[in-house]
Amino acid sequence: NMVVFKQTLPHIPAMIEHISHGDGLKLQLIQFMPELVGQQEWMVDIDSLKKWLELRADKVLVREMHHRRIYLFNGAEVEVVDPVYNAEFCMNCHRIRVTHQGELKGCLNRNDDLIATRGLDDDGLRDAFRKVVANRVPFYGAHVKNFPRRDSRTAVPIEFPGLPAA
């Protein structure tokens, strides 16, 4: 896994080159989520990165979960996890997550829906799971309204210094 933001972006071609020589390696490029941690200026145009991958990959597949593209490079998989303002990701998400502190989380894009599980018995855990499912909100809700909307139709391939254009 590699979080994609301005400081890690230049290392992506080398990471892809590295995994393309391994057997069964997979690189998940995870979109930086400033709405959760701040630092919006670190954000990268993830759609431009996806265009770059699409132009260079040997083959592109589509995963059912989140309807994510899988870019194949010499058999190695590169997958972009891009949930920020991505309705397609949300529409195809059926996951409940568990945080490092054991809290249940119904949406990757939110931290205001956490349900504590510490100390719960079996019945309490069942109730917690039911509650997290009942509290799910499609497409993030309004709590991220201060961040720009995405339009992947206008994306152009990102350029990496020293690498030829596709």
Residue ranges of predicted features:
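Flexible mid-to-C-terminal extensions adjoining Fe-S/redox cofactors in radical SAM and related proteins
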Residues: 86-166
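Radical SAM enzyme [4Fe-4S]-AdoMet core and its adjacent flexible, acidic
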Residues: 1-79, 83
